[in-house]
Amino acid sequence: MSASGGTKAIVAALSANLAIAVAKFVAFLFSGSSSMLAESVHSLADSGNQGLLLLGGKKAKREATPQHPFGYGRERYIYAFLVSIVLFSVGGMFAVYEGYEKIKHPHEIEAWYWPVGVLIFAIIAEGFSFRTAIKESNQTRGALSWTEFIRRAKAPELPVVLLEDFGALIGLVLALAGVGLAIGTGDGVWDGIGTLCIGILLIAIAIVLAAETKSLLLGEAAGTDQVEKIKAAVVDGDTVTGIIHMRTLHLGPEELLVAAKIAVQHDDTATEVANAINAAESRIREAVPIARVIYLEPDIYNEAAARSGTNPAKNAAKDAKGPAEEAPDAKGPSDPTETSH
């Protein structure tokens, strides 16, 4: 997922949310609607969240240092996680509290045309922002469903903006329904119920965001397609005959670490093995350009021994030397290759 695409969606969402937040707050001042107050805080929180995403993207571009040798790519994950915290606390909990207070102490909505007009304007503005996020996401989504895209995306910006914009549109519909029922019935309780529903919605979205960004912070492997490309690139059929085991890890959305133990011929010289490793690294980077950090460890692998036990190197040494001697332990191919969830 390109960083530029994510930035475009973030800027579009930030511009829309700032304008909407001001309009909603003005509508609250004239009407006294708690739904409008909750929605204005919601839009303000969303604006702050987009600012956090932009800040995280900027910090992630810093060069690696001796203290952080793998760079700062995970800054984008950290700031995306902060977004979920802000959405939960500032947006969700405030709306729940405001809704509860309005249900407990209801009052009629004054100057009803202000909240109705602003909500219609906000739905249109959020619709344009949501459309931009969908358009940018479709460039990288491929054949994935939207649920799979959000779960598997390694760059957090677009999934965050998608969920925020989707939540904003649903929240606006809930606010419009609450205000409409309050105006139609003359009972301000409906305004409070709409506000309460908005808070519950924001909390639910915040929990989903927190779960997904937590997985990225813990460290996710490359996607299945990328793993298969790496496997195909490593083996040349001459010096490198196979992969004993391999691990991949995203150091950031666009930085991948690859570590593998590879099988080489037992009679190859050190120079031949070194040249084969360098060639394999070049093939990996060509197949998967985001593979920035690559560690390949050569080892001797015996296929016949692999079929006879779980430790092929050790079993092969036993067959050659007899029961009196044992070769040093070496890992076999029993470790599965990791893929993303």
Where are these regions (language model features)?
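Acidic (Asp/Glu-rich) catalytic motifs at the cytosolic membrane interface
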Residues: A16, S31-K59, Y100, P159-V173
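Residues that define the loop-to-transmembrane-helix transition and helix capping
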Residues: T7, S33-M36, G188-G192
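Topogenic membrane-insertion module of multi-pass membrane proteins
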Residues: M1-A23
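Aspartate-rich (DDxxD/NDxxD/DxxxD) Mg2+/diphosphate-binding motifs
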Residues: G56-E75, H105
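Hydrophobic alpha-helical membrane-embedded segments
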Residues: L18-V26, S31, S43, S47-L53, ...
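Alpha-helical transmembrane segments and adjacent TM-loop junctions that form the membrane-embedded core
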Residues: E75-D319, D329, D335-H341
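Short hydrophobic "helix-edge" motifs at membrane interfaces and signal-peptide entry regions
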Residues: T7, A21-A23, G32, V116, ...
